[in-house]
Amino acid sequence: MSYEKLLERFLTYVKINTRSNPNSTQTPTTQSQVDFALTVLKPEMEAIGLKDVHYLPSNGYLVGTLPATSDRLRHKIGFISHMDTADFNAENITPQIVDYKGGDIELGDSGYILSPKDFPNLNNYHGQTLITTDGKTLLGADDKSGIAEIMTAMEYLASHPEIEHCEIRVGFGPDEEIGIGADKFDVKDFDVDFAYTVDGGPLGELQYETFSAAGLELTFEGRNVHPGTAKNQMINALQLAMDFHSQLPENERPEQTDGYQGFYHLYDLSGTVDQAKSSYIIRDFEEVDFLKRKHLAQDIADNMNEALQSERVKVKLYDQYYNMKKVIEKDMTPINIAKEVMEELDIKPIIEPIRGGTDGSKISFMGIPTPNLFAGGENMHGRFEFVSLQTMEKAVDVILGIVAKD
């Protein structure tokens, strides 16, 4: 179905810079997310007819309710999207609207080209309306496409009270891109039987498996002496960091893994001879494999310290989130409903693991099973990001179908 305000709504949202800040201790981590919630989304939610619209300063979530129009539909269902965008330039976002007929797309005057040679997924969108960047910023379809889709679906239902639907709760939250958005999620306030994050990618994505995730921060303590007299005295902290990294499996890195394969990812390394620091993320799907990865990292550090006869490798290892499959597979109702709706709409469900995490990972373990629905974004987190208007429209259709199911 075509929705008059969907594109306009999306373009309004993406032009607002809501990039999160991993170095901030505030909630949300940027004031722009608060402003977006209070000055843009909250008035709009109230205007389209949502009830009990309220902002929770304790966790940065904006929540609203659309009351049920049917006593027959007993489920209470939530839809969640995040307001922040990823760690890439989000200042002065200038979207392009392209009626795509194939070939390359020039991204404004930036000199960058969105080409099917580099991104074969473009070939799936011939004849569709694409929204791209101008090559200087990201787009923010992750996850403002989700916000626009949820808002459009709620507006449609509020303006068509004759449509039977269950009670619906909507939540727009902060800081998903830096992994802390759902840390303070208020399950009691949201109060639904199950929910969906609308934060996926291409048409048909329906996901209930995520990585289990850990962070690993290492500090290597060296001993700096003059290199001319260093024999048997110098301990080079940078070399220790390299030694640690060399003992991790070489073929278990992000660039060499896919599907259900886990990895170690070194994403930051800095230091001097005297002290060096390295930061990793550890990811895997199965609990036993996840534990093995963490144990290996700890064992390498312990063995290095034993060989050095002192604690020169200091380890901070902490869990970040877990594979929500463990929760959702106990009751597949939200998956079965979404799958049935997609099939009725001639959308092929793509049920594959998320090689990442969503807010739903944490929310599921808090007590609300929360799988992930497609929102349409492609090539997310950078200048080559784009989204199809037609895919966004179908995401709205899916939301409308879900809330009408018993």
Swiss-Prot record:
Enzyme Commission number(s): 3.4.11.4
Biological processes per GO annotation: peptide catabolic process; proteolysis
Hydrolase among keywords: yes
Enzymatic class: hydrolase
Binding-site positions, Zn(2+) 2: 142, 177, 381
Record's cofactor remark: Binds 2 Zn(2+) ions per subunit.
Subcellular localization(s) per the UniProt record: Cytoplasm
Keyword terms: Aminopeptidase, Cytoplasm, Hydrolase, Metal-binding, Metalloprotease, Protease, Zinc
Cofactor: Zn(2+)
Annotated CDD domains: M20_peptT (cd03892)
Catalytic reaction list: Release of the N-terminal residue from a tripeptide
GO cellular component: a single term: cytosol
Domain of life according to the entry: Bacteria
A family per Pfam: Peptidase_M20
Subcellular location, principal: cytoplasm
GO molecular function, one term: metallopeptidase activity
List of catalytic residues: 84, 176
Binding residue positions for Zn(2+) 1: 82, 142, 199
Gene3D superfamilies named among the record's database cross-references: 3.30.70.360, Zn peptidases (3.40.630.10)
Function: Cleaves the N-terminal amino acid of tripeptides.
Family: Belongs to the peptidase M20B family.
Stored HAMAP family: Aminopeptidase_M20
Protein name as it appears in the record: Peptidase T
